Curated annotation (Swiss-Prot):
PROSITE patterns for the chain: ADENYLOSUCCIN_SYN_1, ADENYLOSUCCIN_SYN_2
Positions that bind GTP: 12-18, 40-42, 307, 333-335, 415-417
Species assigned in the record: Rhizobium etli (strain CIAT 652)
Keywords, alphabetical: Cytoplasm, GTP-binding, Ligase, Magnesium, Metal-binding, Nucleotide-binding, Purine biosynthesis
Enzyme class: ligase
Oligomeric and partner information: Homodimer.
Entry's family note: Belongs to the adenylosuccinate synthetase family.
Residues reported in the UniProt entry to bind substrate: V301, V302, T303, G304, R305, K306, R307
Source organism, top-level taxon: Bacteria
Protein name (Swiss-Prot/TrEMBL): Adenylosuccinate synthetase
Gene3D superfamilies named among the record's database cross-references: Adenylosuccinate Synthetase, subunit A, domain 1, Adenylosuccinate Synthetase, subunit A, domain 2, Adenylosuccinate Synthetase, subunit A, domain 3
Statement: the UniProt record of this protein carries the keyword GTP-binding: yes
């Protein structure tokens, strides 16, 4: 038996939600370890769609414990709203199936406002990052700046006013510089006290809880929220998220040691998508890109934003295999490629007349690279709902094998529709 870390190997939206749900049936505990409510995922269970953005996927399955780790930034209002929405769908969330790390940072209204103000200012100067405006980045800034309000602070009303003063000293200075009204101390105090009773019952010393469960033999599934190429260090900086999204963060963001992580499963879409700004070497702005977007329903769960689409970039995924230590991949949305006469895979780039095998870290160089493609024959037959290799056309199998060879990692699972059971299992990541 081993634990499993699920990471996205591209820019997010790889189909992690379905795979995590599929794996959660084999897990006892599902842990979110980074990000906030800026990355959504959709689960389809018995014909019912559940759209989650903060809660771990395991929360919709009976008998599973969901954990929000210390690496997550928690908007308490978003947490309460998501719990209430699930209640309306018949899913009851209590401390018996959800724990929130007491040392997790809270997202406040002033974080959301600052996020939006910065994006608006950047839009006017052409330097927009393309955030979801949900306050994720500013909350992480306060965490690193050692002025954040954390979940545990909601239980200590004696020391909370001083902590609010500290965070407002910083934020009101920023607001004065931006020419907007300052936030009053009472506004933030009221905001925090209004959610305390709803949030505090879920708080726990998560590292201790997970350590006890690990020693007891529980199977733990770590759920990443965004793709590796959005990692603050290893992604396409500055067009990245504000946290580490690679597999190593599963340890830091949950309080478990790296030796407890086990199998690293990279969720990998059979083509490439990206939301928002930033480099995208294989982007297709033609009818094929439109075809992929429409057939793949490439619209953001959280924002509704249309995703940019392009050919599979093996060079980028190969980089993710290295930075995450990926053991195997779950290849998703192969069925979206059905019907295309030919398919292209990027195997490297040309940069200023030189051939390179990875995307450079420099923003300027990233904008200048040109993809080097190989071309494969497509297939006319449908792969939708395939549950064994025998159900796949020969050219589809050839495409999968080519992907494995180019990225240097085997396919452990192959997803052929949004339905959980439409999955070909090659290797069970939870097996010893």
């Amino acid at each position: 038996m081993t634990n499993v870390v699920v990471v996205g190997s591209q820019w997010g939206d790889e189909g992690k939600g379905k795979i995590v749900d599929w794996l959660s049936e084999r897990a006892d505990i599902v842990v979110r370890y980074q990000g906030g409510h800026n990355a959504g995922h959709t689960l389809v269970i018995d014909g019912t769609s559940y759209k989650l953005s903060l809660l771990p996927s395991g929360v919709v399955r009976p008998g599973k414990m969901a954990v929000i780790g210390n690496g997550v930034v928690v908007d308490p209002h978003a947490l309460i709203a998501e719990i209430e929405k699930l209640a309306g769908q018949g899913v009851t969330i209590t401390p018996d199936n959800l724990r929130v790390a007491d040392n997790a940072t809270l997202i406040l209204s002033l974080h959301r406002e600052l996020d939006a103000m910065r994006e608006d200012a950047a839009s006017n100067s052409g330097t927009k990052i393309g955030t979801t405006r949900r306050g994720i980045g500013p909350a992480y800034e306060d965490k690193v700046g050692r002025r954040a309000i954390r979940v545990m602070d909601l239980a200590d009303l004696d020391s909370l006013p001083g902590k609010v003063d500290r965070i407002l000293t910083h934020h009101n200075a920023l607001r004065r510089g931006l020419g907007v009204a300052e936030v009053s101390h009472q506004t933030i105090m009221d905001e925090l006290t209004s959610v305390a009773e709803r949030v505090l019952p879920f708080r726990d010393t998560v590292w201790l809880f997970l350590d006890k469960e690990r020693r007891r033999g529980a199977r733990i599934l770590f759920e990443g929220a965004q793709g590796s190429l959005l990692d603050i260090d290893h992604g396409t900086y500055p067009f990245v998220t504000s946290s580490n999204t690679v597999a190593g963060q599963a340890a830091a963001g949950s309080g478990m040691g790296p030796g407890s992580l086990g199998y690293i499963l990279g969720i990998t879409k059979a083509y490439t998508t990206r939301v928002g700004e930033g480099p995208f070497p294989t982007e297709l702005k033609d009818e094929i890109g439109e075809f992929l977007g429409q057939k793949g329903h490439e619209f953001g769960v959280v924002t509704g934003r249309k995703r940019r689409c392009g050919w599979f970039d093996a060079a980028l995924v190969r980089q993710s295999v290295a930075t995450n230590g990926i053991t195997g991949i779950a290849l998703t949305k192969l069925d979206v490629l059905d019907g295309l006469e030919e398919l292209k895979i990027c195997v490297g780039y040309m940069l200023d007349g030189e051939q390179i095998d990875h995307l450079p870290a420099s923003q300027g160089a990233q904008a200048r690279v040109e993809p080097i493609y190989i071309t494969l024959e497509g297939w006319k037959e449908s792969t939708v709902g395939a549950r064994s290799w025998a159900d796949l056309p020969a050219q589809a199998i050839k495409y999968v094998r080519q992907v494995e060879e180019l990225i240097g990692a085997p396919v452990a699972l192959l997803s052929t529709s949004p339905e959980r059971d439409d999955t070909i299992l090659v290797t069970d990541p939870f097996e010893d």
